[in-house]
Amino acid sequence: MNRLQLLSKGLRLIHKMSEEALAGVPLVHISPEGIFKYVMINVIDGGDASKAVIRGFADCTWHADIFEREEDVFKKLGLRAECPGGGRIEHNPDKKYLKVYGYSQGFGKADHAQTKRILATKYPDYTIEISDEGY
């Protein structure tokens, strides 16, 4: 094999690894209960593939705290991350209820309808409401 063929083979291997890393990223990771900030994150592999995921943690004061924590995780997997927006989530597991609302002062408002669709993949038996009201 010449150098170009070796390089091409290596790049294909790296691309396959990043596709597998992207496929392994969970769509939803949020706190088990309470009211907390959340961000939508577009996770991007080394090529053109990407997916939107939802992250929200009660122990994070700012939307940026959530994004930075998760961005570090994605970087270790060889993935890039972008944040198109955020908001808040109210999670009541006893009532099987989620409410998505508000916005992030730093990132803007996430697409709450898309957030609802993503949350429904993990919580199909929940009532999920969205609202553009509140902060």
Swiss-Prot record:
Keywords: Differentiation, Sexual differentiation. InterPro entries: Janus (IPR007702), Janus_sf (IPR038596). GO terms for cellular component: cytosol. The keyword Metal-binding does not apply. One of its GO terms (biological process) is cell differentiation. GO terms for molecular function: protein histidine phosphatase activity. Substrate binds at K37, S104, Q105, G106. The active site is at H63. JanA and janB regulate somatic sex differentiation. Belongs to the janus family. This is Sex-regulated protein janus-A. The gene is janA.
